[in-house]
């Protein structure tokens, strides 16, 4: 089968680093090609070369049988290559139709916008994707999943033959992900070629036909999904076997440190649990079960309406996040870009932001040398890959951003560390490093609460697991009794040998 799009021998260098070296990618009509690799493998650079953001140093790009060299995203878009970024590019205050045709509005012979034609054309695009909502709806009223469908419709309005999806399910619920997969199947039936960039290997094996693997800027291989198993794919991505994906520390937990009794608040109803010193408590459950809300109430980011919390035997009241920090409770958000990090600030500023009191003189003046030494130590400890501590954190990979977010929490010297989806959007190599750090914290006596939607992660890392369902606790499992089936049963509200606290 002739590819719609073919990139061969692509090389791209930046000062001091070769980002791509002889990289290749083929996209076939009616097929979904996964593009996988660790963070820093060159996936994003390859897409930027393809769309003309970066100029390639060597290699060739063929699209629809012709050699092309786009001078920018507008040229590649108009040629029929659409890209849907991880960060959606829509204006909430405009309608669906206005977003789709922004800057390309239909006009009548008097030069005025032909609203009827614009809405009719937008409705046609939505219908092509089997979407039933009206293009007159405001984008701000749509869920993230529906907004993503608008992005796809916008791409189709350019008659795109190749559509690139970058981490498309990162912010989607399971239902929205299923809808996206239906749309992808529809696009395949219309002959579109899809490039699917994701860290979620389960999805890749579900929706993709073929897989292209990059490692350290090089093309490692292209294989049909049917020829690969997950372990083999991971080995191709990281260049080594991940024999022990979830390194477990067998050090026994100590005495109870945190005791939560009948805690209630927005989306949470009378939840009780304990966490011991040197214990990793896993928190499982489906999207919307109230896991994040429970953690935010505990930390002080959401109001508590009932219940009580004791830490090392003393009552703790957290009305705001500062109260949580003051009591040694640190929460690392699931959405590090919205709640956790300031992307325009440096690695150093982000890392020390909540711990500045430890680097301040009595008059409030900063001890800059001490701050720099501590940040440098944490960068080494966490193996943060950055040219310098002054590098804007927005330029780091997802895995390195997450390490900085966790390091910042540790700088405040907490007793309880809450990690909400700590490996979301992080590649398999960086995940292993984060797991090793979590075990190190456990061995040092820190109490850790690990909230995760990835069942293998919760099972692989936790000493004990509680499960949430519709705002209530539906299960409490010692790790010896925890299985994927038991956790899933509790997550949907069935008791499967679970002990209700």
Curated annotation (Swiss-Prot):
Keywords: ATP-binding, Cell inner membrane, Cell membrane, Membrane, Nucleotide-binding, Repeat, Sugar transport, Translocase, Transport. The keyword Magnesium does not apply. InterPro entries: AAA+_ATPase (IPR003593), ABC_carbohydrate_import_ATPase (IPR050107), ABC_transporter-like_ATP-bd (IPR003439), ABC_transporter-like_CS (IPR017871), P-loop_NTPase (IPR027417). Its main location: membrane. Coiled coil: none annotated. It catalyses: D-ribose(out) + ATP + H2O = D-ribose(in) + ADP + phosphate + H(+). Pfam families: ABC_tran. It comes from the Bacteria. It is found in: Cell inner membrane. The keyword Cell membrane applies. SUPFAM superfamilies: P-loop containing nucleoside triphosphate hydrolases. Its EC number is 7.5.2.7. It is a peripheral membrane protein. Residues 5-241, 252-495 form the ABC transporter domain. One of its GO terms (molecular function) is ABC-type D-ribose transporter activity. GO terms for cellular component: plasma membrane. ATP binds at residues 37-44. The complex is composed of an ATP-binding protein (RbsA), two transmembrane proteins (RbsC) and a solute-binding protein (RbsB). Part of the ABC transporter complex RbsABC involved in ribose import. Responsible for energy coupling to the transport system. Belongs to the ABC transporter superfamily. Ribose importer (TC 3.A.1.2.1) family. This is Ribose import ATP-binding protein RbsA. It comes from Pectobacterium atrosepticum (strain SCRI 1043 / ATCC BAA-672).
């Amino acid at each position: 089968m002739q590819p719609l799009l073919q990139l061969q021998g692509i090389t791209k260098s930046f000062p001091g680093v070769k980002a791509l070296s002889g990289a290749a990618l083929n996209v076939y009509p009616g097929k979904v090609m996964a593009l996988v690799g660790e963070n820093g493998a060159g996936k994003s650079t390859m897409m930027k070369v393809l769309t003309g953001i970066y100029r390639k140093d060597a290699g060739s790009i063929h699209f629809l049988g012709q050699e092309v060299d786009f001078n920018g995203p507008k040229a590649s878009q108009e040629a029929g290559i659409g890209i849907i970024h991880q960060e959606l590019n829509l204006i909430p205050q405009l309608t669906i139709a206005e977003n789709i045709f922004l800057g390309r509005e239909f006009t009548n012979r008097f030069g005025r916008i032909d609203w009827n034609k614009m809405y009719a054309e937008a409705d046609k695009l939505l219908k092509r994707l089997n979407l039933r909502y009206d293009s007159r709806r405001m984008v701000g009223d749509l869920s993230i999943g529906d907004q993503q469908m608008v992005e796809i419709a916008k791409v189709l309005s350019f008659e795109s033959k190749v559509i690139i999806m970058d981490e498309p399910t990162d912010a989607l619920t399971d239902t929205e992900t299923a809808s996206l997969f239906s749309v992808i199947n529809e696009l395949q039936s219309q002959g579109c070629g899809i490039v699917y960039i994701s860290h979620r290997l389960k999805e890749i094996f579900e929706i993709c036909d073929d897989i292209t693997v990059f490692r350290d800027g090089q093309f490692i291989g292209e294989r049909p999904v049917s020829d690969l198993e997950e372990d083999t794919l991971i080995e191709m991505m990281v260049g080594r076997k991940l024999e022990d994906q979830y390194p477990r520390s067998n050090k026994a937990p100590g005495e109870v440190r945190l005791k939560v009794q009948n805690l209630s608040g927005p989306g949470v109803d009378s939840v009780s649990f304990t966490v011991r010193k040197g214990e990793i408590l896993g928190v499982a459950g489906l999207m919307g079960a109230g896991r994040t809300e429970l953690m935010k109430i505990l930390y002080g980011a959401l109001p508590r309406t009932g219940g009580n919390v004791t830490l090392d035997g003393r009552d703790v009241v957290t009305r705001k996040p500062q109260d949580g920090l003051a009591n040694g409770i640190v929460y690392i958000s699931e959405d590090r870009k919205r709640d956790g990090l300031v992307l325009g600030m440096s690695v150093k500023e982000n890392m020390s932001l909540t711990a500045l009191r430890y680097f301040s003189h009595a008059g409030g003046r900063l001890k800059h040398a001490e701050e720099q030494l501590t940040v440098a130590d944490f960068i080494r400890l966490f193996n943060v890959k950055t040219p310098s501590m002054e590098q804007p954190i927005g330029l780091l990979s997802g895995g390195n951003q997450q390490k900085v977010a966790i390091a910042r929490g540790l700088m405040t010297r907490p007793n309880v560390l809450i990690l909400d989806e700590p490996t979301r959007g992080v590649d398999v190599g960086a995940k292993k490093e984060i797991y090793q750090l979590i075990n190190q914290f456990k061995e040092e006596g820190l109490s850790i609460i690990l909230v995760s939607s990835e069942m293998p992660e919760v099972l692989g890392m936790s000493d004990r697991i509680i499960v949430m369902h519709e705002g209530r606790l539906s299960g409490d499992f010692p790790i010896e009794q925890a299985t994927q089936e038991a956790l899933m049963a509790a997550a949907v509200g069935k008791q499967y040998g679970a002990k209700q606290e």
